[in-house]
Amino acid sequence: MSSFWQLLIDIFFPPVCIECRHRISAGMLCTACRKKLQDFRILQPRAYCCPDIESICLFYRYDAGIKKALHEVKFHGKKRLLAAMADEMSILETPKRVCAMWNLPANIVVVPIPTDRKRVAQRGYDVPQGIFSQWSQKQGFVWCEALARIRSTEPQYGLDRSERRKNVRGCFNTIRDIRGKPILLVDDIFTSGATAEEAANILRKQGASHVWAMAFAGGADDDK
């Protein structure tokens, strides 16, 4: 979108905090609500049966305004909120701290978990890509869409953990050479870990040296 049209949108529809509805200049939350809703967590992969992942980081709890915003983006075509989520990644300090804490190598490759092609076609955009691509490039990381879905899957919500793992089993393949490369796997939502582990498993089988995982939100019962 051109800067002129974006300016008009901001004038007539100024951005507001998704939680308290107060005016904001960037991102999707005001400072107070950001402090309230941020739920930075490092998860132990073993607890989620994710042996192919070194460590997992979540930035927001999938609840309240965050959950509503992601639903608006994923099911109601609110692409403008997707841009706000990308801004939010730039505003947050925790992603930078996590990268430093994990001591990620300089040649880290950021790989988004691909959304089912049917859902991308319906929405007109890919949510993980929209949230993380700009952020990764600002960090100086290589952005690489190295994974593709080779079959469609059912939505994960409503399925138990074993059903989710069965649903995504064998749904990914690599479309780029990632042999010997360290990978930072990114997604919009992390819940049971089924999708992330399946993606990490194929990356490791295809030669990735290490895989870390990062998600915008997590901790509820829904998934992709």
Predicted features along the sequence, with ranges:
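Glycine-rich phosphate/pyrophosphate-handling loop used in enzymes and phosphotransfer proteins
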Residues: M1-D187, T191-K224
